[in-house]
């Protein structure tokens, strides 16, 4: 659900109940463990203290337990693990992941403890073995580095791989890794808020790139869970549609018939008479936006005064 200044679970107790009644399985983001939204902590930071398991374990364990108690009678997917305070690396700040490589071993050992205790909380609160409650561990940013150098979670947990925040998949499981009972998932972005630049409010993901990356994802057995970071809904209607249609039927579109998808979308929005031209525009729009996003654009981009004829080269 939406994040930033909002909290799905805390802002209105009817949110979770309504979702459950409608058969909708909810979850939280990669940095919001144990069914707790970040804003629930941020709003009471003076009361709770520092978001650091090494120094504030008692408070954090209670915070985690309250989250599981709240969703124990739902089918909600539980995020386990822990990152820093507010989508940052453990003990660090957003956009500076590389500065904390020398803390990897320390952070890995701390994360092992966090996950072990979280699993115990899940077992204690639900009264069932932890492996009977669906959980996901996001291998996002610096956490992928932990995985690559040896950090592992129990086999029943879904491993959520991620793109690079710009629509390019960072990692896929090999043949041996694909044998995990918990399976694999993908967290994909068409909207991004973070370093080095935001990308929001406009679709900057080329149609062909998104199709190719999601097709690759599926071909490598990453099919247990797909999550799309969409930001604002209205400008992302097309990539949301493509993502959901591919999740429903990953083999429906090929390199040869891919443009049938945006044409079908445009026909529904604008009618058959305008569909061909609208498809052409939509395709070029995402192509050009993907080359240079609005946040990256400046007076030197496609400069008509340079001797390299940038504008005509890129518009071909």
PLM regions and their residue ranges:
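Feature activates predominantly on carbohydrate-active enzymes
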Residues: 1-60, 72, 76, 131, ...
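Gly/Pro-rich turn-and-neighbor structural signature
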Residues: 13-21, 56-181, 290-297, 305-316
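Short catalytic/ligand-binding loop motif for oxyanion handling, primarily in non-cytosolic enzymes
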Residues: 35-37, 88-90, 233-237
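Hydrophobic alpha-helical scaffolding
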Residues: 50-57, 101-108, 146, 199-207, ...
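Short conserved micro-motifs at the rims of enzyme active sites and ligand-binding pockets
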Residues: 91-93, 149, 170-172, 196-200, ...
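Conserved, mostly hydrophobic/aromatic
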Residues: 159, 217, 229, 265
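Extended substrate-binding grooves/exosites of carbohydrate-active enzymes
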Residues: 230-276, 280
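C-terminal non-catalytic alpha-helical accessory regions
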Residues: 259-316
């Amino acid at each position: 659900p939406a994040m930033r200044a909002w909290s799905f679970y805390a802002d209105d107790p009817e949110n979770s109940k309504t979702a459950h009644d409608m058969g909708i399985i909810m979850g939280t983001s990669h940095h919001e463990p144990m069914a707790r939204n970040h804003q629930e902590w941020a709003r009471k930071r003076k009361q709770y203290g520092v978001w650091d398991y090494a120094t504030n374990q008692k408070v954090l364990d209670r915070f985690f337990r309250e989250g599981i108690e709240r969703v124990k009678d739902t089918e909600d997917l539980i995020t386990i693990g822990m990152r820093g305070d507010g989508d940052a690396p453990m003990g660090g700040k957003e956009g500076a992941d590389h500065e904390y490589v020398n803390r990897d071993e320390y952070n890995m050992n701390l994360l092992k403890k966090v996950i072990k205790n979280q699993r115990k909380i899940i077992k204690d609160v639900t009264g069932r073995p932890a492996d009977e409650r669906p959980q996901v561990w996001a291998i996002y940013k610096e956490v992928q580095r932990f995985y690559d150098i040896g950090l592992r979670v129990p086999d029943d947990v879904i491993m959520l791989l991620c793109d690079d925040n710009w629509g390019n998949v960072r990692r896929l499981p090999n043949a041996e890794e694909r044998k995990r009972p918990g399976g694999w998932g993908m967290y994909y972005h068409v909207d991004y808020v973070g370093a080095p630049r935001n990308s929001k409010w406009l679709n900057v993901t080329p149609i062909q790139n998104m199709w190719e990356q999601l097709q690759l994802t599926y071909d490598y057995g990453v099919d247990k869970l797909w999550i799309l970071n969409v930001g604002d809904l209205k400008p992302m209607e097309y990539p949301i549609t493509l993502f959901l249609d591919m999740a429903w039927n990953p083999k429906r579109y090929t390199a040869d018939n891919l443009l049938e998808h945006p044409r079908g979308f445009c026909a529904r929005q604008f009618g058959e008479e305008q569909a061909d031209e609208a498809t052409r525009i939509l395709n070029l729009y995402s192509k050009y936006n993907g080359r240079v996003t609005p946040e990256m654009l400046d007076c030197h981009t496609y400069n008509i005064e340079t001797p390299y004829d940038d504008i005509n080269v890129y518009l071909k």
